[in-house]
């Protein structure tokens, strides 16, 4: 059987960059990550502690472990993580747009009229949660360990692991038939100009991207690019900043280097400037973030 390609489609991130069981205390029992841009649909498994997620639309959810979250792409969120009995433990899988398209085709073919009607009558939801049923935690971990690349924050092919495609589909199926689930999937397969620009920039953050270069990649003029981004109420500089800050968060969480090295990998010439921008963006210094995530 030929499976849909999952090459560079799933990225694994854990609070423990060595991908071993980990429990760590937080500073003052609470860690906040503010203004984090969710670039791809995100599966988030909370093993220990509690988590509150809030987005720019005022939607929020708060749950204690163990549970699984599914977050929609193209939203900005604040994550508030609290320890329970001195610990918090989590892992995440970032699922690409291409892979969500393939899952959508499968789920769409199995839905019925009532599912569609329920979705239309439901207020849009940008994240869901599900209890961890028997086997779900092990399934998540098998995917996580199958694609994880210790200390290197990059997408990894899992084409050779046939079970991973169906395992991931199984986990996402836990959310599909929830109210608003199909509506969520339909939004997940649409891609904005903002997302296209983001994907180009983050593909090589060591490069100094100009609007003209990105416009050329998208086969449009600079004026057309500016017009499309203005219609989406976002600027080129904001997308550039989100890409750099997201990569910084991932690299720091994965332990991919010290602060100076991370600054360079994110396209910054000086560590001091990177630290200032990171603190202004996330309301926490890179060093405090590293201590929190990798203690």
Swiss-Prot record:
NCBIfam families: PRK15044.1. SUPFAM superfamilies: Homeodomain-like. Changing residue 271 to L: In strain: ATCC 14028 / SGSG 2980 / CDC 6516-60 / NCTC 12023. It holds the Pfam family HTH_18. Residues 195-292 form the HTH araC/xylS-type domain. Keywords: Activator, DNA-binding, Transcription, Transcription regulation. It comes from Salmonella typhimurium (strain LT2 / SGSC1412 / ATCC 700720). Residues 212-233, 259-282 bind DNA. The keyword Transcription applies. SMART domains: HTH_ARAC. GO terms for molecular function: DNA-binding transcription factor activity; sequence-specific DNA binding. This is Transcriptional regulator sirC. Positive regulator of the expression of the invasion-associated type III secretion system encoded within SPI-1 (pathogenicity island 1). The lineage of its organism: Bacteria, Pseudomonadati, Pseudomonadota, Gammaproteobacteria, Enterobacterales. InterPro entries: Homeodomain-like_sf, HTH_AraC, HTH_AraC-typ_CS, Tscrpt_reg_AraC-type_HTH. It comes from the Bacteria. The keyword Transferase does not apply.
């Amino acid at each position: 059987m030929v499976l849909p390609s999952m090459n560079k489609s799933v990225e694994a991130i854990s609070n423990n960059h060595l991908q071993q069981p980990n429990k760590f205390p937080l500073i003052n029992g609470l860690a906040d990550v503010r203004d984090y841009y969710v670039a791809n649909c995100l599966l988030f498994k909370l093993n220990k502690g509690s988590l509150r997620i809030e987005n720019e639309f005022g939607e929020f959810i708060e749950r204690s472990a163990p549970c699984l979250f599914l977050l929609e792409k193209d939203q900005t969120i604040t994550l508030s993580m609290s320890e329970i009995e001195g610990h918090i433990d989590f892992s995440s899988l970032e699922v690409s747009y291409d892979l969500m398209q393939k899952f959508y085709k499968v789920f769409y073919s199995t839905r019925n009229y009532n599912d569609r009607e329920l979705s239309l009558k439901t207020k849009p939801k940008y994240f869901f949660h599900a209890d961890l049923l028997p086997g779900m935690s092990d399934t998540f971990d098998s995917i996580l360990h199958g694609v994880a690349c210790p200390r290197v924050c990059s997408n990894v092919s899992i084409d050779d692991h046939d079970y991973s495609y169906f395992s991931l589909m199984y986990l996402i199926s836990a959310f599909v038939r929830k109210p608003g689930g199909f509506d969520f999937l339909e939004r997940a397969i649409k891609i904005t100009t903002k997302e296209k620009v983001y994907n180009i920039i983050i593909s090589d953050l060591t490069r100094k991207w100009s609007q003209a270069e990105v416009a050329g990649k998208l086969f449009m003029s600079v004026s057309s690019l500016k017009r499309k981004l203005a219609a989406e109420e976002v600027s080129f500089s904001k997308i550039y900043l989100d890409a750099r800050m997201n990569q910084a968060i991932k690299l720091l969480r994965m332990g991919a280097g010290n602060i100076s090295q991370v600054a360079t990998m994110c396209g910054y010439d000086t560590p001091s400037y990177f630290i200032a921008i990171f603190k202004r963006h996330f309301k926490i210094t890179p060093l405090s973030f590293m201590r929190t995530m990798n203690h």
